């Protein structure tokens, strides 16, 4: 898996991602090592405490008013004569905390998509205002267990995304286990 093609929240495609800023993040699996006096230097039992997790981080550098509004909340402003609100002329920050929680898809150049049914975007306006760097929206995508208790994320070929994803769900683990059993029998 390599190369970020697009980051999507439901049907919204996030703007340009800063080169080399995307990191899968997260935590490594944790375990407790049980050691015995009779066996020096190596554990006699390893107890799994938690699976590993992902928490992607990335910087959005396409800072138009629509992206500021979509990723940070707040209010877009329009000229008085723009009654259809087609061309924003400004943006103001929100007065309350804003959470973008729900389904996310990270479409990769390599042909896969990472699907996250229940992700929460934490974002802030950051970066530098110089002639060699730009301001950016610094984002962390926290991955949580879906309300239905299904898998927190999965990776599929982009051209074969499961039907369940139309409801922003991943296929049940049982169907995946059945498919792998069928493959083993062939």
Predicted regions and their residues:
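Beta-strand elements of well-folded, non-transmembrane domains
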Residues: 58-64, 108-112, 143-147
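Acidic, glycine-rich flexible loop segments
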Residues: 88-129
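Charged, amphipathic alpha-helical segments
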Residues: 63-93
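Mixed-charge, glycine-accented linear interaction segment located at domain edges/termini
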Residues: 113-186
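Short secondary-structure capping micro-motifs at structural edges
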Residues: 40-48, 85-94
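Beta-strand secondary-structure signal
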Residues: 55-59, 103-105, 138-142
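Solvent-exposed edge beta-strands and adjacent loop segments
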Residues: 1-68, 118-136
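Intrinsic disorder/low-complexity segments
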Residues: 7, 94, 98, 108, ...
């Amino acid at each position: 898996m390599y190369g970020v093609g697009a980051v999507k929240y439901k049907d919204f495609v996030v703007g340009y991602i800063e080169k080399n800023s995307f990191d899968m993040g997260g935590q490594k699996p944790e375990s407790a090592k049980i050691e015995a006096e009779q066996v020096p230097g190596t554990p006699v039992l390893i107890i799994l405490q938690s699976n590993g997790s992902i928490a992607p981080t990335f910087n959005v550098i396409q800072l138009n008013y629509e992206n500021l509004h979509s990723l940070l909340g707040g209010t877009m402003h329009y000229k008085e004569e723009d009654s259809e609100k087609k061309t924003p002329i400004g943006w103001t920050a929100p007065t309350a905390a804003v959470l973008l929680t729900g389904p996310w898809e990270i479409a990769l150049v390599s042909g896969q998509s990472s699907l996250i049914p229940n992700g929460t975007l934490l974002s802030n306006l950051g970066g530098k205002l110089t002639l060699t760097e730009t301001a950016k929206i610094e984002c962390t995508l926290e991955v949580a267990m879906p309300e239905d208790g299904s898998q927190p994320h999965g990776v599929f070929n982009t051209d074969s995304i499961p039907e369940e994803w139309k409801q922003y769900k991943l296929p049940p683990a049982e169907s995946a286990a059945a498919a792998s059993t069928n493959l083993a029998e062939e």
